[in-house]
Amino acid sequence: MRYTSAAIESLIEEFAKLPGIGRKTAQRLAMHILHQHTDEVEKFASALIDVKQKVIHCRVCQNVTDIGADPCAICCAKGRDRSVICVVETPSDVLAFEKTGQYRGLYHVLHGVISPLDGIGPDDIGVKELLSRLSPDDGPRVSELIMALNPTVEGETTVLYISKLLKPLGVQVTKIARGIPVGAELEFVDEATLSRALEGRSAL
């Protein structure tokens, strides 16, 4: 059953394009928006536009940051161990590790994994940017790279590719420990499990 309002149907269709949102949920969201005050809806619309216009990738770690805050707050933070880089798939994974309060190194966000079936190769993710960080002109040398990608076939493929690429550079490459279910996404793993996986990492 479709609404008689084309505007409502259009909004439902847009909400339904979001991951994990079916038509019923999209309908509820559209009805919620319809009954909100105009100023609240305008704030919501403004926030959506700001995300596209003001958010960029940090030029160092490729994590998300705002225009005018590049490098990002983590890359600029004092007290971080700059000899260790944790390689993750998405910005959400950075948040997951930060919530543990255990990791004090830096990060590198790939924004994807190697997936030949989807036409995604090494040049389509942040591998080139990662390599450029391992031979800095100044500052401390990176001694360890922690591979913390989701335990999927594509994630494992990416881990193997990067570890082989870095072997000649003399950088120790480690991988977070098992204990995270195969196919799970790191952003949904609880802090205690993630901390244990980080502490129990092993060399590749």
UniProtKB/Swiss-Prot annotation:
PROSITE patterns: TOPRIM. SUPFAM superfamilies: Recombination protein RecR. InterPro entries: DNA_Rcmb_RecR (IPR000093), Rcmb_RecR (IPR023627), TOPRIM_dom (IPR006171), TOPRIM_RecR (IPR034137). Residues 83-181 form the Toprim domain. The keyword DNA damage applies. GO terms for molecular function: DNA binding; zinc ion binding. One of its GO terms (biological process) is DNA recombination. The keyword DNA-binding does not apply. Keywords: DNA damage, DNA recombination, DNA repair, Metal-binding, Zinc, Zinc-finger. A zinc finger (C4-type) spans 58-75. Pfam families: RecR_C (PF21175), RecR_HhH (PF21176), Toprim_4 (PF13662). It comes from the Bacteria. May play a role in DNA repair. It seems to be involved in an RecBC-independent recombinational process of DNA repair. It may act with RecF and RecO. NCBIfam families: recR. Belongs to the RecR family. HAMAP family: RecR (MF_00017). This is Recombination protein RecR. It comes from Prosthecochloris aestuarii (strain DSM 271 / SK 413). The gene is recR.
